[in-house]
Amino acid sequence: MSTSIFVNVPVRDLAAAMAYYKALGFEHNPQFTDETAASIVISDTIYVMLLTHEKFQDFSKKPIPDFNNEIGALYALSRDSREAVDAIAAAALKAGGTEQRDPDDYGFMYSRAIADLDGHVWEYVYMDMAQFPSE
C-alpha cells in the first residue's frame, strides 16, 4: 500500500471551499464528505480534508488562527510544466484566491503562491531537473 497524506484544513464555508477546489480541477470524494467535512482528491495519494471549524476542533483544541493574517504552513504541489503552474494559478485567482508574492523563477524551478479562500497558502511548483545547477 502506498503512503498517503491527508492535509486537514479548517474552512469557514464548506460549500465555498469545495467550489474553490473544484474550480482548480480537483474532484471531491463523496465517501468522505458530509455537512462538516469534504475530501478533495489531489492525486492517488494526496487528499485535502476541508473541515468546518467545529469539525476541526474535534481533532485539536488549539485555537484556529486567522490564516489571512497568520501562517502555519505552506503546502507545495508539483506541476508538469511552467504553463501548468500558470494555469492552476490563474484558476485559483479566478476562483477567489489571492496571489501571495510575485512568481519565483530560478530557471530550473518556477513557482507561484496562492492563498485559498481561508488563507491557506498553496505553492504550485515546476522543477526542470535537467536545468538544476550541478553545484
Feature-to-residue mapping (PLM):
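N-terminal beta-strand motif that seeds the catalytic metal site of vicinal oxygen chelate
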Residues: 1-18, 74-77, 128-135
